[in-house]
Design a protein with these regions (language model features):
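TPR alpha-solenoid repeat register
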Residues: 73, 106-107, 142, 176, ...
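Canonical tetratricopeptide repeat
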Residues: 42, 76, 109-110, 143-145, ...
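Terminal, low-structured helical/coil segments at or just beyond the last alpha-helical repeat
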Residues: 22-28, 202-251
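Residue-level recognition of tetratricopeptide repeat
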Residues: 36, 70, 103-104, 137-139, ...
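Bacterial Sec signal peptide processing site at the extreme N-terminus
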Residues: 14-35
Length: 251
């Protein structure tokens, strides 16, 4: 977003507030300040989506000057600091964003941040809070995140429960499908593992991990051509990966 477009966004919001309040300075009215705050937040998020975190800070700071406790502004600034690898500042703003009440979207983002920091128990607790919102449109992803966190906590049975719930909410969750395929394979439940794997391949591109799993499943079901084909893809696309090294060790 250019500076000209940014200024136009804010000025348009102020103009709309001015029109609705007559000739009163819009910044001296609650409606005008709210309009300016929302415009600054939108501008900051626009910069953030472009990867311009330094630019994003300026309008987000202005938004917080108008409304210090605003959840959206604090959550956006938390994402900025998370992107810039400033964990203490990110954590601070996530907490501020949630201080006025739980929001499933912010809780999920905060949980993701905590997961990235290796704080798995804290992340799990935040994801659990987010999952309590039955109307949150991305609830299936929250359960997927719960499953991933449970794996980090070495609780495979709990992880399967969460991945299963994620897939009940949305059958087309590639990561949940791949994880269920892997967990089923590890438990020697090869038929469901193959089912999950085939569902995964229909909706997502292959990666090193899925190619290795696919080759292993093909070997289990004595499909030598498929096993060889997937092995060649793994060699060609991911030659230096641990997955390819593991594949070689199994031949």
């Amino acid at each position: 977003m250019t500076l000209r477009a940014a200024l136009l966004l804010v000025s348009t919001a102020l103009l709309a507030a001015c029109v609705s309040t007559g000739h009163v300075d819009p910044m001296k009215t609650d409606k005008g300040r709210d309009a300016a705050r929302d415009a600054y937040i939108e501008l900051g998020i626009g910069y953030l989506k472009q990867g311009a975190t330094e630019r994003a800070k300026v309008p987000l700071k202005k938004a917080l000057e108008l409304d210090p406790s605003n959840a959206d502004a604090n959550a956006a600034l938390a994402l900025v600091f998370q992107t810039e690898m400033e964990p203490d500042l990110a954590d601070q703003h996530y907490r501020k964003a949630l201080s006025s009440g739980d929001d499933a979207r912010i809780l999920n983002n905060y949980g993701t941040f905590l997961y990235e920091q290796g704080r798995y128990k804290d992340a799990y607790a935040r994801f659990q809070q987010a999952a309590e919102d039955n109307l949150y449109p991305e609830r299936s992803r929250v359960f997927e995140n719960l499953g991933l966190t449970a794996l980090k906590m070495n609780d495979q049975a709990l992880a399967k429960q969460h991945f299963d719930k994620a897939l009940r909410l949305n059958r087309q969750q590639p990561l949940a499908l791949l994880e269920m395929a892997q967990l089923s394979f590890d438990e020697k439940q090869y038929v469901p593992a193959r089912d999950y794997y085939e569902r995964f391949t229909k909706i997502a591109p292959q990666n090193a991990r899925s190619l290795l799993l696919g080759a292993r499943l093909a070997t289990v079901f004595d499909d030598r051509d498929q096993a060889a084909s997937l092995g060649l893809q793994l060699k060609r696309l991911y030659p230096g990966t641990p997955e390819y090294q593991q594949y070689q060790s199994e031949q």
